[in-house]
């Protein structure tokens, strides 16, 4: 008797055929899985590259804030200093600075909206490189301190800053809070810096 008759004859041939088909199906499935994985990886790489290109053109999540710079020479006025934050340059940056004490006094005195805008300090900065700081100009701070609300407009969107300066033990202390200004969705805190000993209210918070 032949070998196939000893081990089952046609049955073994069928079995071998089934095994070959199964192996072929497994191989095809593996190849498809690998192919899909490669395509998914390539798609993610392309999406990541496109985002990097867009961020480099628009400015990504970069923002800026303003802080007062004080000098050892007391006769020199403090300067408002613009500071860049983020991985990408900021493009087409313009800034509007509102002194809240002046604004509230002018509102009580009946100033018109046009008059109020004339009293605001505005800066057309243009482009701001990464890690760049730029002095915008001197500022006069009253003895009781100053409250500034600062509004930024750039190619990558809008953001705003609350800047508070108070004198403590003959030293100026600063509190800064920067938030995005989305057209929709929730406001997000971008940056916050509060000097040690800055005056706080009874709840332990800054009076923003």
Predicted regions mapped to residue ranges:
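N-terminal positive-inside, membrane-proximal cytosolic segments immediately preceding the first
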Residues: 1-13
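Membrane-proximal alpha-helical anchors
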Residues: 14-85
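Terminal, low-complexity, charged helical segments
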Residues: 66-74, 82-86, 111-122, 126-127
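Short, hydrophobic/aromatic beta-strand segments
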Residues: 88-97, 106
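Short loop/turn segments at connectors of secondary-structure elements within structured domains
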Residues: 76, 89-91, 144-146, 159
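Intrinsically disordered, low-complexity Pro/Gly/Ser/Thr-rich segments with frequent PxxP/GP/PP motifs
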Residues: 33-36, 103-157
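Acidic, serine/threonine- and proline-rich intrinsically disordered appendage/tail regions
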Residues: 158-208
């Amino acid at each position: 008797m032949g070998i196939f008759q000893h081990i089952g004859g046609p049955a073994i041939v069928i079995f071998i055929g089934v095994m070959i088909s199964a192996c072929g199906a497994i191989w095809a499935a593996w190849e498809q899985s690998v192919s899909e994985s490669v395509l998914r990886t390539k798609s993610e790489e392309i999406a990541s590259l496109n985002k990097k290109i867009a961020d480099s053109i628009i400015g990504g999540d970069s923002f800026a804030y303003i802080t007062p710079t004080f000098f050892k020479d007391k006769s020199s006025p403090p300067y408002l200093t613009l500071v860049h934050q983020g991985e990408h340059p900021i493009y087409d940056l313009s800034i509007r600075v509102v002194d809240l004490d002046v604004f509230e006094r002018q509102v009580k005195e009946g100033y018109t909206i046009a008059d109020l805008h004339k009293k605001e300090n505005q800066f057309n900065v243009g482009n701001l490189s990464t890690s760049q700081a730029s002095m915008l100009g001197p500022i006069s701070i009253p003895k009781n301190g100053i409250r500034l609300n600062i509004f930024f407009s750039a190619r990558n969107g809008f953001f705003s800053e609350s800047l508070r300066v108070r004198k403590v033990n003959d030293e100026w202390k600063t509190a800064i809070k920067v938030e995005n200004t989305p057209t929709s969705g929730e406001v997000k805190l971008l940056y916050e810096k509060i000097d040690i000993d800055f005056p706080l209210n009874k709840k332990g918070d800054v009076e923003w």
